[in-house]
Regions:
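Active-site region of the double-stranded beta-helix
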Residues: 1-14, 28-179, 187-238, 244
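Intrinsically disordered terminal extensions flanking catalytic oxygenase cores
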Residues: 242-250
């Protein structure tokens, strides 16, 4: 699975950790790597981290797997989202989805989380502390993005989910199969499935703090706040073979 129209160098220069980018189906040929039944099957297994977010009268509720087979049969018409972490460790086709993103150093790769949502399903407005490529595998999803958030951003009083108390979208897009939305760390976002059969692959890239990178050099240094920032720039290690062309934005 490879890109057909995408320039890694221009992306790293203009968008990486700076601003979101919508990439309309850049693949040579897009094929959804995993069927919904396969994802549901993983959510039944011990040792696989899975969650179920259900919309109800009282708001969003979160359940942790492994789940019984009858749990999905009892969901009915209520909007819901199933999320399974690190699917790349369990399915070779999903693991192959990482390969086109190897222009980013491998040590930054976190995992590929896969979600399946019914019509109206989502996990609510939130932000993450990592770079992520949201690959629409099947179906459609509306994504909205807002301002940058941080430790002081107000959150709703929810026991299980870190949901933003305030979310004013500044841009929105509808993604279809094969489309990709890149989001930098800290950017508020909200995704809602349009219709059933919505599958999204979240290819996440963490940025270790300097304190993590030098942890082996001694505890006192690692605890120094001046080394706790996330400041490693992937553009510094960009292979020379990439040229400076403009990204395909659709």
């Amino acid at each position: 699975m490879q890109f057909n129209q995408f320039d890694p160098a221009a992306f790293l220069r203009d968008y990486w950790q700076k601003q979101p980018l919508l990439i309309r189906n850049p693949w040579r040929q897009w094929t959804n790597p995993l069927e919904p039944d396969g994802l549901a099957g993983l959510a039944l297994e011990d040792g696989v981290e899975s969650r179920l977010v259900v919309h109800g009268a009282a708001g969003l509720t979160l359940e942790h797997g492994p789940f019984g087979e009858d749990r999905f049969e009892r969901l009915g018409e209520t909007p819901w989202t199933l999320l399974v972490q690190a699917v790349d460790q369990h399915d070779p086709a999903v693991a192959a989805l990482i390969e086109p993103f190897r222009f980013i150093p491998s040590w930054r790769i976190d995992d590929v989380m896969v979600s399946y949502a019914s019509d109206g399903g989502g996990v609510g407005p939130h932000f993450d502390q990592y770079d992520v490529f949201l690959v629409q595998g099947a179906g459609r999803r509306r994504w909205q993005v807002g301002p940058l958030c941080g430790a002081n951003s107000p959150l709703l009083p929810h026991a299980d989910l870190r949901l933003l108390a305030e979310f004013e979208p500044s841009e929105e897009w509808i993604l279809e199969a094969g489309d990709i939305l890149y989001l930098p760390p800290g950017l508020a976002h909200n995704g809602v499935a349009i219709g059933d059969g919505c599958m999204t692959y979240s290819v996440g890239f963490r940025a270790p703090a300097r304190s993590e990178l030098i942890a082996g050099l001694g505890q006192p240094i690692g605890e120094d706040s001046q080394f706790a920032e996330h400041s490693v720039d992937v553009a510094d290690v960009l292979p020379a073979r990439y040229t400076w062309r403009r990204c395909s934005e659709g």
